[in-house]
Regions:
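Short beta-strand-to-loop acidic/aromatic patch adjacent to the donor-nucleotide binding site
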Residues: 56-67
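Conserved catalytic core of nucleotide-sugar-dependent glycosyltransferases
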Residues: 48, 69-158
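N-proximal low-complexity "stem/linker" segments adjacent to membrane-targeting elements
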Residues: 1-42
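Anion (oxyanion) recognition and catalysis
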Residues: 25-26, 81, 174
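Short, high-confidence coil segments that cap the C-terminus of an alpha-helix
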Residues: 56, 82-86, 178
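Polar low-complexity intrinsically disordered regions
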Residues: 4-8, 65, 74-79, 195
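C-terminal catalytic/acceptor-binding lobe
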Residues: 1, 144, 148-222
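Active-site nucleotide-sugar/metal-binding loop of Leloir-type enzymes
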Residues: 45-58
């Protein structure tokens, strides 16, 4: 069994990401492939083609600003071993309101203005669930999925009108008959940066005081 860890990136990667990658526990043979490119969809396309040429069995897509537990690959592989083809870890956007990159509904209209998508904030929490699209911060799939998508569409990640490359791939994969799954038990972090101001401090203090008040109220009822 051979897995390629596919990392589309620019010229640099986050230190925390590198630390996570070094600690990632393999299952079978594991190769790491960075593909620097200013066009991320092209980087993903090139990585997909490389995975096919290298005759890998699986591809773990990981963005270079992710932080993940050492058992991430093993846990997602267990989901595929139950008969799935594509499964995503739980990842959130790195800017407010920090929504999960899960899409309950995704429809491509005749024009981009008619496209539809529905975020899934209150997703199931007890085990893997099906959805229509995911972000690709951390996704494991069988390499055979890539071959099937290329054979039908000639491309993997080229953006469709009104959609980014990740959702465009999901549309193609579903068009090939694949289900897309996510596992809420596999949580990964999204490295973010922020500009800290007085408003940032005040918002954090209000949230902290509220949490402390809730905890104190709960203790009073014990």
């Amino acid at each position: 069994m051979k897995t390629m860890v596919a990392i589309p990136c620019m010229d640099t990667v986050q230190t925390e990401f590198a630390d996570s990658l070094l600690k990632l526990r393999p299952k079978g043979l594991m190769m790491h492939c960075f593909m620097p490119c200013s066009l991320i969809y092209k980087s993903r396309n090139d990585l997909g083609q490389l995975a096919i040429r290298e005759k890998t069995d699986y591809v773990l897509w990981v963005d270079s600003d992710m932080v993940f537990p050492s058992d991430t690959l093993i846990d997602l592989m267990a989901d595929l071993e139950e008969g799935r083809d594509i499964v995503a870890a739980t990842c959130h956007m790195r800017r407010p309101p920090f929504r999960p990159v899960f899409y309950k509904k995704l429809r491509m209209g005749i024009t981009p203005a008619e496209n539809e998508h529905e975020n899934w904030d209150d997703y199931p929490k007890d085990g893997p669930f099906k959805l229509e699209a995911v972000g690709f911060g951390c996704v494991l799939m069988r390499t055979s999925v890539l071959e099937t998508v290329i054979n039908k569409y000639g491309d993997l990640f080229a953006p469709l009108p009104g959609f980014g490359e990740e959702l465009s791939f999901c549309i193609r994969a579903r068009g090939c008959g694949y289900d897309i799954w996510a596992d809420p038990r596999v949580q990964v972090g999204h490295k973010a940066s922020t500009i800290v101001t007085k408003e940032t401090f005040e918002a954090f203090r209000r949230a902290t005081e509220h949490a402390e008040g809730v905890q104190a109220g709960a203790e009073d009822h014990d």
